[in-house]
Amino acid sequence: MNIQRAKELSVSAEQANVSFQGMPVMIQHVDESNETARIYEVKNPERELTVPVNSLEEI
């Protein structure tokens, strides 16, 4: 996924179909300077991760 699309999905009111390593996630924040995204698992919202934006897939 590219940074612009990740930013669009992070501010969208709709639930996006995004996955990280096969697990459904939500994007909380995108850090353009580091090209990373703060995400959390849909099934486990307390598990937050910072991952490279290019590791996210829109499904």
UniProtKB/Swiss-Prot annotation:
GO terms for biological process: asexual sporulation; sporulation resulting in formation of a cellular spore. It comes from the Bacteria. InterPro entries: SASP_SspH. GO terms for cellular component: endospore-forming forespore. Induction: Expressed only in the forespore compartment of sporulating cells. Its main location: other. The keyword Cell membrane does not apply. It is found in: Spore core. Keywords: Sporulation. The keyword Hydrolase does not apply. Belongs to the SspH family. This is Small, acid-soluble spore protein H 2. The gene is sspH2.
